[in-house]
Amino acid sequence: MKKLTYGMVGGGPGSFIGDAHRKAINIDGKATMVAGCFSRSIDKCRETGAQLGVAEDRCYVSFEQMAKAEAERPDGIDFVVVVTPNVSHYPVCKAFLEAGIHVSCDKPLCLTVEQAEELEQLAEKKNLLFMVTYTYMGHVTAKHIKRFIAEGKLGKIRTVMAEYPQGWLAYEGEWGGKQGAWRCDPKQSGGVNCLGDLGTHVENAVATMTGLKVKRVLAKMDVVVPGRVLDDNDVVLVEYEGGATGCYWTSQFAIGHKNDLRVRIYGEKGSILWEQENCEKVTMIEYDGTEVVRYRGAPGIEPGAAAYGRLPSGHTEGWLESMGNLYRSFAECVEAKKNGVFTPDMIDFPTVHDGAEGVKFVHACLKSNEAGNVWVEL
């Protein structure tokens, strides 16, 4: 079978996330990168392209030029991967959708609710696939929880506690480097830092695992580190449709925490604990207090989730494999589209709709915070 081809916007010199996407796509070998606009500097773009084996004539000076040229080529790319700072997600994604090219975009989807709704509508109008890479939901154990809860095995959800603390931005100018600089810059991040970077992952993790839809939020967004202008610590109270409640905490100055996304879900029949830094296992407490631990690669994992496992139990799979799982499903759907056999039930990745829900969540939190920490409907 001929491999799919893709291009990348962003992901030039020093880009952590661009390199991660390329490695994740390579895990299953379903697509090859053949084009890119890796930097606003054409010299840096060509330098990166040469390092990655991309022909010079497919290293573009702008994303607009790339979208137009690739759409016109008989061998044009099948999809584009957008890994730029937040501020440019919307124009880049829009350009490729208008050119008829499937899109994978890093989160958050964009900066405003209006932009999110436009991208969602445009993808639907053009009949194009659009993935937003909430990477952690590619973990086998996260997929297990989603299926376990959907089958009613936890009963009605009563409350959710979720947190995502990091400590890498505990001091202004320390550790962050290039990655911290743009996140803390309102012009590049869109006026929100911690909540847009970490809070969107929390919102998506809970929504994906539980199926709960946020009804309203009450948020307190703090700016704590001296010299910083955007939030670096957030606490959000959540009420879901149906009456369940939740509490989310995200922080970038929580010294001692690295990438500590955790979700605790409490239902009528028991509870579930999932930890991103210990993502090989799921801990479940049954109604009578019995603790049941399920491990990726071992018996007890829901079959649809277990199918994404690559290695025997005890051979650790992690973050790159999780993103690779998202790209496995995305590539299979793109291939099915090309062959005229695609059906919506094939989708097993976060879509533009999920990305739009994340943007709406962030903006409701902003409104709540600005109004003095009051309840705001989504």
Spans of features found by a protein language model:
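C-terminal helix-rich "cap/oligomerization" subdomain common to oxidoreductases
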Residues: 1-3, 70, 81, 329-378
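N-terminal Rossmann-like dinucleotide-binding module
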Residues: 1-54
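Redox-cofactor binding/interface segments in oxidoreductases and associated redox assembly factors
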Residues: 38, 82, 105, 162
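A structured beta-alpha segment of the ubiquitous adenosine-cofactor-binding alpha/beta core
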Residues: 58-77
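Beta-strand-loop-alpha-helix segment that lines the small-molecule cofactor/substrate pocket
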Residues: 79, 85-137, 152
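Predominantly a Rossmann-like dinucleotide-binding segment in NAD(P)-dependent oxidoreductases
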Residues: 129, 136-228, 236, 282, ...
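Glycine-rich, aromatic-lined ligand/substrate-binding cores of catalytic
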Residues: 198-271, 275-280
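C-terminal glycine/acidic-rich active-site capping loop/insertion
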Residues: 235, 240, 269-349, 353
